[in-house]
A protein has these predicted regions:
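An N-terminal-biased, well-structured beta-alpha scaffold segment characteristic
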Residues: 2-106
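Glycine/serine-rich phosphate-binding loop and adjoining beta1-alpha1 elements at the start
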Residues: 2, 79-162
Length: 162
């Protein structure tokens, strides 16, 4: 199967759907993996790391969509991507269907096979555990005196002027 790893284009999104180690496993299983140039940079994975694991680098998202049977990315599709989806192409990404009806309609119109990343793990799994721990750490960080400390916290929580 031809698997495509897209560079996310949503503003503020720096994650990548597959690490070089995961690409290595896909290639080892006999898949051809295409990675869009720069897909892993925001997560600390240079293009060379993907090539070392057997991926083929491509310049554009259009090449990924046109070439690959399976396309994956982290965040929901942007409107500029809707026209690139193909019938029977398998896509895996966050979709959040209730919040993005126009995206759902584009997926239906394209006749692709879509899987939602946000619903692909069991709630309470390590993924959620990690998110919970990170949330607690960010909360603690906000209470540090260099970030305003407890006074800022009280003001935010109880609307008490400082």
């Amino acid at each position: 199967m031809k698997v495509g790893v897209l560079k996310d284009i949503k503003v503020g999104e720096y994650r990548v759907i597959a690490t070089p180690a995961e690409v290595s496993m896909l290639v080892g299983d006999g898949n051809e993996v295409y990675v869009q140039k720069g897909a892993g940079e925001g997560s600390g994975f240079p293009d060379e790391a993907y090539v070392k694991e057997g991926a083929k680098l491509v310049d554009t998202k259009e090449e990924i969509y046109a070439t690959c049977d399976f396309v994956a990315k982290v965040k929901e599709f942007e409107p500029c991507e809707y026209k690139l989806l193909r019938e029977n192409q398998i896509v895996f990404t966050c979709i959040h269907p209730a919040a993005h009806p126009e995206e759902v309609q584009a997926l239906l119109d394209s006749k692709c096979i879509a899987f939602t990343a946000e619903d692909s793990h069991r709630y309470g799994s390590p993924n959620c555990e990690a998110a919970g721990k990170a949330g607690a750490l960010f909360g603690l960080e906000s209470l540090l005196s260099i970030n305003g400390g407890m006074q800022e916290y009280r003001a935010a929580m109880f609307f008490v002027p400082t």
